[in-house]
């Protein structure tokens, strides 16, 4: 049975309470069983497309897809993979904005299972706790590693950091290209989607919000 950290449990419960958790069902199979079953189904899908899986280039594709789905691009569906977060007491009394910009976003659109590619900015005003800067990137990556819609993703990482840091003073900005728009349908290769979410002082104070937006647009 997977062990889920207390931080992961708190974040998950906060998302459920707000109604912004990714729609999921309870998993009853272990990873090996899920990989094996996905591999079998992907073999059927590829054959229905007319691909010859006896070809050297294709014969391992069902296995590669199953492993990629479970262990990599959808690993964020399993809270046992939530990054280990150690909050540090804010003994230096840091009171200025902490901003991490240009965090790489690579996720998967839950409507068509194609790529979402973009950048994320995360800012917060420390109160009692601070966290290591790399942990911010890791939390963003965790929520990217699941089928997503950008609006929900933005709200999820806002709530996650508010929960971990025990402060409402968090701001999120996401700018991304959606390959469901770029490579199919309208096939618009130039457009991008921007979403943002603000809490606490970022929501209540226009000047604070303006400072954040000015910093990320420099």
Swiss-Prot record:
Domain of life: Bacteria
Pfam families: GTP_cyclohydroI (PF01227)
Keywords recorded for this protein, A-Z: GTP-binding, Hydrolase, Metal-binding, Nucleotide-binding, One-carbon metabolism, Zinc
PROSITE patterns: GTP_CYCLOHYDROL_1_1
CDD domains: GTP_cyclohydro1
InterPro entries named in the record: GTP-CH-I_C/QueF, GTP-CH-I_N, GTP_CycHdrlase_I, GTP_CycHdrlase_I_CS, GTP_CycHdrlase_I_dom
Catalytic activity line of the entry: GTP + H2O = 7,8-dihydroneopterin 3'-triphosphate + formate + H(+)
Name of this protein: GTP cyclohydrolase 1
Source organism: Haemophilus ducreyi (strain 35000HP / ATCC 700724)
